[in-house]
Amino acid sequence: MRRPVGGAAGLALLASAAMTGCVTPEATMPGCQPGGRLGILAQSVPTATLVPCVQEMPVGWNFDSLDVDSGRARFWLDSDRAGLRAAEVELSPSCDLEGATLVAPEEEGAERYQRLSSLSPRFVGATYDVFEGGCVTYRYELVHGPHIGLYQELHDAVALFPRQALAEDVRNDLGLDFDP
């Protein structure tokens, strides 16, 4: 018999399965493979068909921290060139796209929008990946000059992982079903 994993109880179960021993920033990084950290992000926004993950950290970038609540999950990345928390990546049920421009998508199943607040002296803005049931917002403040490389490194580092693959992993490993 399979039991659904949902709400606070589901988050707690996945968190306890995912967090053992000492917790370092790298230990809480949601990597792009099925498992606890990614499952916790998925459960925070149960309608999201895609979940942000870190596929490979570029040279000069570090994972800072992860914050997960019901209805939202976010994490921060530090850069040796752009500073601490140079980028924030947030998963939510929806995004405010007012003033954003549709740009070429990088992920299958998602539309990408961009809104820039400043080009100089710092490159400041947000990129939005919008998909069924959710949105990932990338907020960044990057050093002008090397900003194009930093911007590309950020978007190369973060990918979108299919919720369905996570659900199958949890079902196979734990005998539990994700909500909804």
What function would you assign to each model-found segment?
Residues 23-31:
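Bacterial lipoprotein signal-peptidase II cleavage site
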